[in-house]
Amino acid sequence: MDALTTFDHIIINANLATFSAQYGFDTYADNKDSISAAAKSTPYGQLENAAIGIKDSKIAWIGAHTQITPYLTHYQSQQITDADGHWITPGLIDCHTHIVYGGNRSNEFEARLHGANYQDIAAQGGGIVSTVRSTREANIEELFAQSEKRLLALVKEGVTSIEIKSGYGLDLKTERKMLKVARALGDKHNIHVSTTYLAAHALPPEYKDRVDDYIEQVCQWLPILHSEGLVDAVDGFCENIAFTTEQIKRVFEVARSLNLPVKLHSEQLSNIGASALVAEYQGLSSDHLEHLVEDDIKKMATSNTVAVLLPGAFYTLRDTKLPPIEELRKHQVPMAISTDCNPGTSPLTSLLLAMNMGCTLFYMTPEEVLAGATVHAAQALGLAHKGRIEVGCDADLALWDITRPADLAYQMGLNPIEGIMIKGAWR
């Protein structure tokens, strides 16, 4: 029997943005010494008039539409999707989110616009302490229901994999509750969820003036939650207003002992060596990066650490310090884009809008931001079989009614999704 007759599902008459090096994708071809690299690169790794064969939830074959048409009679109609010349990308990946939380902080948003500053809001029990309080008070069913709405908003725009952090519990009971909700969201909606332990996010009120004592607790909770199957990676907030590199290093040492990958909120407000620390531990990603310097970029390039850029926070905070995009290009550091969905500084549940912000605010190209929401986002989560349309990769795909891939970053407020495939099944 011919191999082209044995797929579980086939997609025909499609244009593909593969983001695969096998099809010429190379974001940084223009930054390489070889002139031929740029000449050989294909924007988006695109293939036109193509077809895909899917078997056992994986991409099993990619070829020309004309190659598969003689075999269509071997398939039932429900096994065939005619893309009608529209574009297919890898399913989008939101690689930095805080979507599991309780409460709402729109009152603080309003207060700031009436002139209140951070200190005023904090004095009234607002800020992150407000979210911690609401998250602790919510039971697991309430927390799931609130968080599910945010997840589904992202899925409706083509997101098939998502990272979800803890970090609004700041005690063992609530950190566990948050991570359980994250797992449950993935299970219910058949979407890949990468969980990240972020207890080193802020200092809880009960540990005021006892930062080192709290970090000791963070280190003790990690093996417990990992043993319960709740932790895929470890994160921290490394800033003058949060935790020092030495304190984060203590957490990273525990992560290393458990063979857990690390990442870090780095260089958002200042530079205290956070990205250099991530690189020292061969971390998956360093995130925010407005104050990143070239020496640390070189270290990230050596450690293959992804730069995760978060324009939603930049926008919400009205920041003016741009991340060093040109230097990241120069040293060929992969750049990812994410919503950073959180209640305080980026209440954003649109990865498409984050991509547009990456172009408009950070001067990234449409190809860079779409790569940043697919292949580079997958790298930022250590997901080797996601983020590309390539034989052997997971069949997580998004079908779009667009004329060219750049439309996804160009349009605002219009969702051109036509179909979402997760693990080989349309939803």
From Swiss-Prot:
Identify the main location: cytoplasm
Keyword field contains Iron: yes
List, separated by semicolons, the cofactors it needs: Zn(2+); Fe(3+)
Q: Which Pfam families match?
A: Amidohydro_1
Per the UniProt entry, the disulfide pairs are: none
Highest taxon of the source?
Bacteria
Binding of Fe(3+): at which residues? H96, H98, H265, D340
- Give the E.C. number(s): 3.5.2.7
Swiss-Prot/TrEMBL GO biological process terms = L-histidine catabolic process to glutamate and formamide; L-histidine catabolic process to glutamate and formate
Q: What terms describe the molecular function in GO for this protein?
A: imidazolonepropionase activity; iron ion binding; zinc ion binding
Cofactor binding description: Binds 1 zinc or iron ion per subunit.
Instruction: List GO terms (cellular component aspect).
Output: cytoplasm
Q: Does the keyword Disulfide bond apply?
A: no
Q: Quote the catalytic activity from the record.
A: 4-imidazolone-5-propanoate + H2O = N-formimidoyl-L-glutamate
Biological or metabolic pathway of the protein = Amino-acid degradation; L-histidine degradation into L-glutamate; N-formimidoyl-L-glutamate from L-histidine: step 3/3
Q: Tell me the residue numbers annotated for binding N-formimidoyl-L-glutamate.
A: Y168, N342, G344
Q: Which residues form a coiled coil?
A: none
Where would you find this protein in the cell?
Answer: Cytoplasm
- At which positions is 4-imidazolone-5-propanoate bound? R105, Y168, H201, Q268, T345
Arranged from A to Z, the UniProt key words for this protein are: Cytoplasm, Histidine metabolism, Hydrolase, Iron, Metal-binding, Zinc
**Residues reported to bind Zn(2+):** H96, H98, H265, D340
Give the family per the record: Belongs to the metallo-dependent hydrolases superfamily. HutI family.
Briefly, what is this protein's role?
Catalyzes the hydrolytic cleavage of the carbon-nitrogen bond in imidazolone-5-propanoate to yield N-formimidoyl-L-glutamate. It is the third step in the universal histidine degradation pathway.
> What's the protein here called?
Imidazolonepropionase
Q: Which organism is it from?
A: Psychrobacter cryohalolentis (strain ATCC BAA-1226 / DSM 17306 / VKM B-2378 / K5)
